[in-house]
Amino acid sequence: MIKLRDELGTATTDSAQKILLLGSGELGKEIAIEAQRLGVEVVAVDRYANAPAMQVAHRSYVGNMMDKDFLWSVVEREKPDAIIPEIEAINLDALFEFEKDGYFVVPNARATWIAMHRERLRETLVKEAKVPTSRYMYATTLDELYEACEKIGYPCHTKAIMSSSGKGSYFVKGPEDIPKAWEEAKTKARGSAEKIIVEEHIDFDVEVTELAVRHFDENGEIVTTFPKPVGHYQIDGDYHASWQPAEISEKAEREVYRIAKRITDVLGGLGIFGVEMFVKGDKVWANEVSPRPHDTGMVTLASHPPGFSEFALHLRAVLGLPIPGEWVDGYRLFPMLIPAATHVIKAKVSGYSPRFRGLVKALSVPNATVRLFGKPEAYVGRRLGIALAWDKDVEVAKRKAEMVAHMIELRTRSSDWHDQNYEKRKHLLR
């Protein structure tokens, strides 16, 4: 692992520090931009050409990241200082091999291996971190799934052991939903579909992400710094809107920090962790963990001071650079600049060369802006951008972000224009 760093070189020279992004979506793009600001050389990898991060990288490679030989060919050629996974669809054996060969995998190969597999993650949360979670059981047959759902109780959630963004998951309201849940898990799983996890439904007040970052302090000691919890809601298992700070009690906020600290201490390494939790009153349950910047954390592009978004914090940690913070009641906290919110801009249709309109109206709204990711292809439900808004009142920011997002229309080469108003579930402005 790298140590506290006081020097940086210059990109494309023999003094350069170099990062290799495995995954080049919108989150990787922001990491790449922050790296460019510090003169760090950026190499981006993804399964398709001209992915967002590739557009701001020094070099890029296109290939199957589940192919270990392909990954090794890139790593041996580039010899990066840090290998930064941005997605889950990566050959895990390769990550362990890179580490064994002396490369720095962020935060470490084991954390990535645990986080992408729900059984490994749940057992780590409960048995190693010893944090509260919803009740859960596993099923490997349809009969076992019926039995597990009965024991957990209705409603409950079924999820493929390996999946993301809501794929392979089902909200089971009663026994009549179980065949559909079984089919969803079996057909939408990533990798093995042998086992399904059944989780108790928590009737939470708000779902939050704690963007805990493990990094070196100015004395060279690894510490964990906690930004304010980010509130968010999902539609069909995928992030749709987020805001910071989440509206939770002071007691719940301290519990969020406590749980995130226990989890990240167990996972180890350096970098930011998106720790997802449910909050109801003063009670908090751990849910999932992403050992990388989190999509809900894009709100920090507005809510944090310039140069300190979740992407900048991640990069600082990865490079061995310090992050400022203030100790309050035993936790090292990162100060927020202003309450802010995001709302997604999604495609309703599929096709190439997306175009956007409504920008004159959207970009005329005070204290708001739009980020378009530059993805060359749209498909139904794909996130192509976000609206960002900020205000001293987080509720105002939430409504403004939603309003601005819904001002944007988009089309592709093969489709007509469509707006964002086809989706109204959970929205504030109906």
Curated annotation (Swiss-Prot):
Residues crossing the lipid bilayer are none
Q: Name the SUPFAM superfamilies for this protein.
A: Glutathione synthetase ATP-binding domain-like, PreATP-grasp domain, Rudiment single hybrid motif
| Principal EC category | ligase
Q: In which pathway does it act?
A: Purine metabolism; IMP biosynthesis via de novo pathway; N(2)-formyl-N(1)-(5-phospho-D-ribosyl)glycinamide from N(1)-(5-phospho-D-ribosyl)glycinamide (formate route): step 1/1
EC identifiers of the protein = 6.3.1.21
Q: Which sites bind Mg(2+)?
A: E276, E288
Keywords in alphabetical order: ATP-binding, Ligase, Magnesium, Metal-binding, Nucleotide-binding, Purine biosynthesis
Which amino acids does the record list as binding ATP?
R118, K159, E199, E200, H201, I202, E207
Recorded hits in InterPro entries, A to Z, give: ATP-grasp, ATP-grasp_carboxylate-amine, ATP_grasp_subdomain_1, PreATP-grasp_dom_sf, PurT, PurT/PurK_preATP-grasp, PurT_C, Rudment_hybrid_motif
Q: Which domain of life is it from?
A: Archaea
Query: Per the record's keyword annotation, is Oxidoreductase included, yes or no?
Result: no
One term of GO molecular function: magnesium ion binding
Keyword NAD annotated: no
Q: Domain named ATP-grasp: which ranges?
A: 123-319
Q: Which reaction does it catalyse?
A: N(1)-(5-phospho-beta-D-ribosyl)glycinamide + formate + ATP = N(2)-formyl-N(1)-(5-phospho-beta-D-ribosyl)glycinamide + ADP + phosphate + H(+)
Q: Report any Pfam family annotated for this entry.
A: ATP-grasp
Q: Which family does it belong to?
A: Belongs to the PurK/PurT family.
Q: What's this protein's function? A: Involved in the de novo purine biosynthesis. Catalyzes the transfer of formate to 5-phospho-ribosyl-glycinamide (GAR), producing 5-phospho-ribosyl-N-formylglycinamide (FGAR). Formate is provided by PurU via hydrolysis of 10-formyl-tetrahydrofolate.
What HAMAP family does its record include? PurT (MF_01643)
Assembly notes: Homodimer.
Q: Tell me the protein's name.
A: Formate-dependent phosphoribosylglycinamide formyltransferase
Please report the organism this UniProt entry assigns to the protein.
Pyrococcus horikoshii (strain ATCC 700860 / DSM 12428 / JCM 9974 / NBRC 100139 / OT-3)
User: Which taxonomic lineage does the organism of this UniProt entry have?
Assistant: Archaea, Methanobacteriati, Methanobacteriota, Thermococci, Thermococcales
Name of the gene: purT
